[in-house]
């Protein structure tokens, strides 16, 4: 089961061993992913329903072959479909928490100066970024003003443990894990046969995420 970006799927496929990718580029091998498009659609639709004046997505510059790119694509497509003003900031980068925080702080300051009086709907790539952004709001205002809504992604522990519990898109980790194991065992059982039948085409499974509404949205 591969969760890193170290080896491309073409290389992994050449080893001819049972292998499953989770949330990674997987053109040539089987994979299990969260339905990232659906998750971003849920997040964006919520911010639109809550009548935010401007929607902003904050992320790293994701490779288009990565499943997580669908979060960017869905955000943009949904905003354009409903004719909602939006901005996409893919400048997040850093090898440490403090490097990431410095970049998130720059983005926060830019948003503050560009959209001071508008209701801002912020959809962040994950709950770590969402918590950083939330802390910056509290450091400036001492509260969570009505001019902000925040949605994260993953439903990691930090989302519920934050100073204000964060609305997020929950990945069904238990379902992802079971599906990956089922696919892996299926491949392993096939290899035990006297004449193994190679998998014709890679199998790609998408697991539906769940919108978890908390205190950073209406």
Annotate each predicted stretch with a short phrase:
Residues 32-57, 73, 77, 99-110, ...:
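Hydrophobic alpha-helical segments within soluble ligand-binding/sensing domains
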Residues 1-42, 113:
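Alpha-helical recognition/docking segments in bacterial nutrient-uptake
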Residues 6-8, 63, 71, 128-130:
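Alpha-helix capping/helix-boundary segments
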Residues 89-100:
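Short beta->alpha junction loops
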Residues 110-218:
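Flexible loop/turn connectors
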Residues 43-89, 196-217:
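An alpha-beta-alpha
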Residues 15-19, 84, 145-148:
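A short helix->loop->beta-strand "cap" motif at the edges of active sites that frequently abuts
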């Amino acid at each position: 089961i591969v969760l890193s970006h170290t080896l491309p799927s073409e290389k992994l496929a050449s080893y001819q061993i049972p292998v499953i990718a989770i949330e990674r580029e997987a053109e040539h091998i089987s994979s299990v992913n969260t339905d990232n498009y659906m998750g971003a659609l849920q997040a964006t639709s919520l911010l639109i329903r809550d009548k935010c004046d401007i929607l902003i997505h904050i992320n790293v510059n994701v490779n288009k072959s990565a499943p997580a790119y669908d979060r960017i694509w869905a955000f943009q497509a949904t905003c354009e479909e409903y004719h909602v003003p939006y901005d996409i900031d893919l400048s997040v980068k850093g090898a440490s928490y403090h490097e990431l925080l410095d970049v998130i702080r720059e983005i926060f300051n830019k948003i503050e100066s560009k959209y001071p009086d508008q209701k801002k709907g912020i959809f962040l790539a994950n709950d770590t970024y969402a918590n950083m952004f939330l802390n910056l709001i509290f450091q400036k205002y001492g509260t969570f003003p009505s001019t902000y809504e925040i949605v994260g992604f993953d439903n990691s522990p930090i989302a519920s443990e934050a100073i204000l519990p964060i609305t997020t898109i929950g990945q069904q980790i238990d379902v992802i894990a079971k599906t990956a194991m089922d696919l892996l065992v299926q491949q392993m059982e096939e290899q035990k046969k006297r004449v193994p039948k190679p998998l014709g085409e890679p199998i790609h499974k998408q697991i539906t995420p769940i919108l978890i509404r908390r205190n950073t949205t209406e």
